[in-house]
């Protein structure tokens, strides 16, 4: 919420398949903004169109930073998946995505409730 300068929701996500290493430093070597990399891109993203996809409700993302400017062309979207947990499991790795920030199904339902009637929502994707 920009008016009170605080996050409305914060939750763990599964990242791209190359970004799940056993310690944080190595994860930064496995980020990419390149098409076909199947790696995560960090930075701020505008939450765009809602749609029903392969994994249920999903939202297209438009990258706002140079580190994630290709999110839309890479088809990186925000979605839920049953193999992602609602709680941090670090230092163990989660099952990776092809670059999408993936929430647990439960958390995605909560996020969807917040996003359904909003516009101009920005998320911050980080490791």
Across the structure, where does each feature detected by a protein language model lie?
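Cell wall/extracellular polymer interaction/catalysis modules
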Residues: 1-98, 105-122, 127
């Amino acid at each position: 919420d920009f008016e009170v300068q605080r996050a409305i929701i914060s939750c763990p996500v599964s990242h791209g398949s190359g970004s799940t290493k056993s310690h944080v430093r190595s994860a930064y070597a496995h980020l990419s903004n390149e098409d076909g990399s199947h790696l995560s891109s960090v930075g701020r993203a505008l939450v765009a169109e809602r749609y029903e996809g392969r994994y249920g409700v999903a939202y297209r993302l438009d990258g706002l930073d140079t580190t994630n400017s290709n999110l839309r062309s890479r088809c990186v979207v925000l979605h839920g998946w049953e193999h992602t947990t609602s709680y941090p499991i670090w230092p163990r790795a989660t099952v990776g995505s092809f670059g999408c920030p993936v929430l647990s199904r439960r958390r995605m339902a909560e996020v969807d409730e917040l996003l359904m009637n909003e516009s101009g929502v920005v998320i911050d994707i980080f490791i």
